[in-house]
């Protein structure tokens, strides 16, 4: 008589690479948050993964760049030369520092330029005591010993005057300066800022645009967090 084997958690492992890109963050969420869905599901503001992130037992992070936080102006402003990364959805399992703040990864801060630093993991792997049943969202929170860190925006919704080549910036926390490169939606060419003052910037050779309101992307403010997950999968 044929019998059907029961489904159980076995030693079979699945490895998935995931890149959290701030230009794919969920709209209206602050701090920035990401929705994780299999590649077969399409839609705006979705980070595609190979399959469902279930039964996660290990998470690995690799070095990546961040812009200077709004609270910092020089490398010496990072207390202890360290930055910590915490994922809100994983708060039941995390390290705690002497002040009781939770984190999953600790990084050494290395200066790269006047506007960016590189984060080098002190220990790049976090092993979960209990497997995480499912991961659908990830909300990374950065902080140092002075508290949470906020970052300049990498995407701005702006108004443009195509005749005068003026773009009016609606907010201040963009940290754009003369010579910075930006990307204007609808025009596939890296533009260079000519001047920037009084909350108006001047772009070289900007073409006529179909709409006065466009998106302006700022590469130096973009954050991409490379993560690697190991999951235990059910076998029959």
Swiss-Prot record:
Induction: Expressed in the late phase of the viral replicative cycle.
Keywords: Late protein, Virion
Subcellular location: Virion
Role, per record: Forms the penton at the fivefold vertices of the icosahedral capsid. Together with the minor capsid proteins (p17, p49, and M1249L), forms a complicated network immediately below the outer capsid shell, stabilizing the whole capsid.
Source superkingdom: Viruses
Any coiled-coil regions, as ranges: none
Chief location bin: virion
Protein name: Penton protein H240R
Organism: African swine fever virus (isolate Pig/Kenya/KEN-50/1950)
GO CC terms in record: virion component
Family in the record: Belongs to the asfivirus H240R family.
């Amino acid at each position: 008589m044929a019998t059907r084997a029961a489904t159980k958690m076995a030693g079979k492992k699945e490895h998935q690479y995931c890149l959290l890109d701030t230009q794919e963050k969920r709209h209206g969420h602050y701090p920035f948050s990401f929705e994780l869905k299999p590649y077969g599901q399409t839609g705006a503001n979705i980070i595609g993964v190979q399959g469902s992130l279930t039964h996660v037992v290990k998470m690995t992070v690799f070095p990546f760049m961040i812009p200077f936080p709004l609270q910092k102006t020089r490398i010496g402003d990072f207390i202890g030369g360290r930055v910590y990364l915490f994922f809100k959805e994983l708060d039941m399992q995390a390290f705690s520092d002497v002040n009781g703040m939770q984190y999953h990864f600790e990084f050494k801060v290395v200066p790269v330029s006047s506007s960016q630093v590189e984060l080098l993991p002190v220990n790049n792997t976090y092993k979960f005591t209990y497997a995480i049943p499912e991961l659908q969202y990830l909300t990374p929170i950065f902080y140092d010993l002075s508290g949470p860190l906020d970052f300049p925006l990498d995407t701005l919704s702006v108004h443009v005057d195509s005749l005068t080549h003026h773009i009016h910036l609606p907010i201040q926390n963009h940290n754009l300066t003369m010579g910075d490169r930006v990307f204007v939606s609808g025009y596939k060419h890296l533009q260079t800022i000519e001047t920037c003052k009084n909350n108006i910037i001047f772009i070289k050779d900007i073409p006529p645009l179909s709409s006065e309101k466009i998106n302006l992307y700022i590469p130096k403010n973009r954050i991409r967090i490379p993560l690697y997950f190991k999951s235990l999968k059910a076998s029959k």
